[in-house]
Structure formats: structure tokens, C-alpha cells
């Protein structure tokens, strides 16, 4: 992959801490917020931002506790991330935006869109979080050859959620960064590409934000508050009319192509793009396709927006 255009990391004061972010594109263009998941950072958008910036004002924050953002003494629950992201958006003066999200970034995007539907110009998303009634819905697959891999993923995440085991695996062994992340990418990342993913988490204590997220996954009704919030957010998503773009990989991880097809068909104004071979961190395998598709999608929406307003 070609060396990305370097985009300067900036920092904003947020709730007594700071959040780092990448920003590029024309200031007067429509804003696009890029929201990453666990255990990544805005680094995952590095090859996508330059492709979208010709048509948009791109802002990609590092979630609190991740990347180069601060690590305040908080629990790093989903609702902590909601508070910090809300404050970041207010601090940056963003009043409307396209949302581009993956993994936990999608949960934040869905929750934001449910609370502030007028804020959302459009939503592009992939490998998304949703309320999962049973453990079989986590890493669900309809392909027989994928069943063993899916069951192994469930077993690992059950351990992450188990007191003591999760701490040993994520805080001590750094398993999420060293195993889950590369295991969710088809190509092999070199040390130079992995370094920005490793640097934020040098010690067990620094990895607490990474441990918190798998324990927040809304599975079988737990945790109850997150499960309920995402049920409401998904109901709002199903009722929404803003444009949507769903990317899916083959075989995917949280989202199989078959599930993605049904999900897109159930929504209003949702296009589906099949990227080909991909697991969970689709941005690392398909940056070019994602970037060009998002840019074209935004340009198309903005071209007709003045006509709709007339």
C-alpha cells in the first residue's frame, strides 16, 4: 500500500482531558465525522481521509482513552464515550455531519443519530454493533466452513467478559492489540503500520479502555443499559430517512454479507457495497474502495441538496 499523506494530529480540550483528532479538507465543505472502534484510533482512517477530503471537511477523533487522546480516570463505559464525543462535537462547533463509522464507532453513531436526527446528513457504516439477543448472534455466520471460527471468537469474548480472565488476556497479555486486531485484517500489517496501534497501550493500566469495550457489547440483554440504549438507537435507525451506505466484507466478522444484505434492505435509502475479502477492520484491507465510495456518495447527495431545499 502506498505511503499515506500525513495529516497533522490536533488536540481539543474536552471535559478536563483532551481528545486528539485528524482534520483535513475545506473548512466550508460539509463535515464528515469518522468514528473508529476498539482498539484502534483515527490511524485506521489514514488512507481514507485523503480520498474524502476533496468533497468534505473531514474530522476523525481518537476516542477518549484511545490513540493520542487523554486517559482520564473513568470507567470507559459506552456512555462515557457518548459524553466525551458529544463534548468534542460541541467544542469543534460541528452542527451537522455525515457519519462514517466502524465497530464501536457505529454504536456511537447510531446513538447520536437517534438523539439528534437533524444533525445527521448521512451515515456510512460497516461491521456494526447491534443488540444481540443470544451469543449465537455474535459472529453469526450462515456458512458451514466458518462455524468453528465463529465459535472460537465467541469463546474468546466470553473470556474477555469474565472477571480475572479478561484482565489477564487484555491488560497483561495485550491480546486485543496483538491478536484480535491483526486477526481481523486479511493482509499482514508491517511494524510501521502497527506502531500507532501499539503505542497508546504500553502498560496494563493503559489498556483499561480496551478491556472495557468487550464488556459493553450488548449480548443476551447485558449490560442492560447499553442493550436498551442500542435497541432504541436501532429502532430510530430503522425509522430514519437520511441516506445510508453499508459496507460488507467476505466473510466479515460481526456482520456477514448475507446479514448485511438483509439489513440494508430493511432500511430506507440504504445502499450496500460488497468489498470482497474482508474480516472486521475493513478499512485496513479496502481503504481505497471505502474512501472513493464515501466521497462519491457524499458528492451525489450534496449535488441534489440545493434542489431539495428549493
Curated annotation (Swiss-Prot):
Entry GO MF terms: haloalkane dehalogenase activity; hydrolase activity; identical protein binding
EC code(s) of this entry: 3.8.1.5
Superkingdom field: Bacteria
SUPFAM superfamilies, per the entry: alpha/beta-Hydrolases
AB hydrolase-1 domain ranges (all copies): 30-140
Catalytic activity: 1-haloalkane + H2O = a halide anion + a primary alcohol + H(+)
Active site per the UniProt annotation: 103, 127, 280
Signal sequence segment: none
Keyword annotations from UniProtKB, A to Z: Hydrolase
The protein's assembly and partners: Monomer.
Function: Catalyzes hydrolytic cleavage of carbon-halogen bonds in halogenated aliphatic compounds, leading to the formation of the corresponding primary alcohols, halide ions and protons.
Protein name: Haloalkane dehalogenase
Amino acid at each position: 500500500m502506498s505511503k499515506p499523506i500525513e495529516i497533522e494530529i490536533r488536540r481539543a480540550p474536552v471535559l478536563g482531558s483532551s481528545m486528539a483528532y485528524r482534520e483535513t479538507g475545506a473548512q466550508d465543505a460539509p463535515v464528515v465525522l469518522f468514528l473508529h472502534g476498539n482498539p484502534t484510533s483515527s490511524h485506521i482512517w489514514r488512507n481514507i481521509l485523503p480520498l474524502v477530503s476533496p468533497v468534505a471537511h473531514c474530522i476523525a477523533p481518537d476516542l477518549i482513552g484511545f490513540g493520542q487522546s487523554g486517559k482520564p480516570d473513568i470507567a470507559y463505559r459506552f456512555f462515557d464515550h457518548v459524553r466525551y464525543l458529544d463534548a468534542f462535537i460541541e467544542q469543534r462547533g460541528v452542527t451537522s455531519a455525515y457519519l462514517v463509522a466502524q465497530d464501536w464507532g457505529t454504536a456511537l453513531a447510531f446513538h447520536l443519530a437517534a438523539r439528534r436526527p437533524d444533525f445527521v446528513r448521512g451515515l456510512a457504516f460497516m461491521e456494526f454493533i447491534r443488540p444481540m439477543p443470544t451469543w449465537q448472534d455474535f459472529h453469526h455466520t450462515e456458512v458451514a466452513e466458518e462455524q468453528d471460527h465463529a465459535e472460537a471468537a465467541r469463546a474468546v469474548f466470553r473470556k474477555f467478559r469474565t472477571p480475572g480472565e479478561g484482565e489477564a488476556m487484555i491488560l497483561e497479555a495485550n491480546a486485543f492489540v496483538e491478536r484480535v486486531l491483526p486477526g481481523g485484517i486479511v493482509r499482514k500489517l508491517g511494524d510501521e503500520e502497527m506502531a500507532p496501534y501499539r503505542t497508546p497501550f504500553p502498560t496494563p493500566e493503559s489498556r483499561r479502555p480496551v478491556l472495557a469495550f468487550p464488556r459493553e457489547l450488548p449480548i443476551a440483554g447485558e449490560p442492560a443499559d447499553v442493550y436498551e440504549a442500542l435497541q432504541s438507537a436501532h429502532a430510530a435507525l430503522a425509522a430514519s430517512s437520511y441516506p445510508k451506505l453499508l459496507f460488507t466484507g467476505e466473510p466479515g466478522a460481526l456482520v456477514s454479507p448475507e446479514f448485511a444484505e438483509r439489513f440494508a434492505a430493511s432500511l430506507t435509502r440504504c445502499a450496500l457495497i460488497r468489498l470482497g475479502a474482508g474480516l472486521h477492520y475493513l478499512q485496513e484491507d479496502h481503504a481505497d474502495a471505502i474512501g472513493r465510495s464515501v466521497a462519491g456518495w457524499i458528492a451525489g447527495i450534496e449535488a441534489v441538496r440545493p434542489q431539495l431545499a428549493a
